């Protein structure tokens, strides 16, 4: 059974990709900062479109193969596929 989900961040202002780990630096409102980390990333499509005015990111769970998430902004869409769940961490420096 597939499970859809959706959650919001105002915008992704930066990201890092080290090996199989993708970390998104997000700003919600004026003062709230979040890091959203994805581990064991299999595929990342549209990497150039991650930073920008992201209005939401959403996706679905594939039993046995993991998660596919889509990041939508005003011009193009990026997506990431990972077999593991992600982690949201409040705050970041900078």
Would you name each region that the model predicts?
Residues 1-94:
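Surface-exposed, interaction-prone regions used to assemble/regulate multi-protein complexes
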């Amino acid at each position: 059974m597939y499970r859809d989900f959706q959650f919001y961040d105002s915008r992704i202002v930066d990201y890092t990709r080290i090996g199989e780990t993708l970390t998104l630096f997000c700003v919600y409102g004026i003062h709230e900062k979040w890091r959203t980390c994805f581990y064991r990333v299999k595929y990342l499509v549209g990497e150039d479109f991650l930073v920008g005015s992201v209005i939401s990111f959403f996706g679905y769970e594939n039993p046995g193969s993991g998660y596919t998430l889509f990041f939508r902004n005003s011009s193009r869409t990026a997506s990431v596929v990972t077999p593991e769940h992600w982690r949201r961490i409040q705050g970041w420096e900078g």
